[in-house]
Amino acid sequence: LQDELTGALIGLAKSCGSNPKTDNTDRIIIEGLFTTITNVNFNNETLKNMIDRVHKEKNIILPDCSVCQSRCGNTDDYDMNNIWDADEDIRSLKSLILFGIRGMAAYAYHAMVLGCTDETVNNFFYKALSIISYDMDSEQLLPVVLEVGEVNLKCMELLDKANTTSYGTPAPVKVSLSVEPGPFIVVTGHD
């Protein structure tokens, strides 16, 4: 289902190429990509609901496509097997783009929840998703891979701004390492 969701997101991104997106489109793209990150969601119902949200959004943007008699295929969901069955160099570069924007979506999602967004970051999701579906060679894909890194830095700055605006500037503090009697709660995390 994660591949199906990714293919639907690619179709949605391509639908926005020359059509105006709604106020909700960026959120759906970011949430959808974030949903496909390892260890974020294993619930099939949640994935199916996200796929439905993507399809509904695409129908809002392009209402005539769903009833078109002479389908062009330009906005259809992308078949992810096209990547997995591709030449190993193309598969590797497209995978770097895909996994890079998935990771970037995690940062963008958390920043968005805190009220911070960036048009450059959001627009790059559409560009990268669309490029994944194009028939491109290694020479054309490599600059996009590098651009993922550049935009990811901008996205990390966005998340830092969101966090420091919401929670203040983090600073190291001393904590007690002594063992106390009684029940306790352990809080862990990573970044």
At which residue positions do the language-model features occur?
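Metallocofactor- and cofactor-centric catalytic cores in central/energy metabolism, strongly enriched
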Residues: 1-191
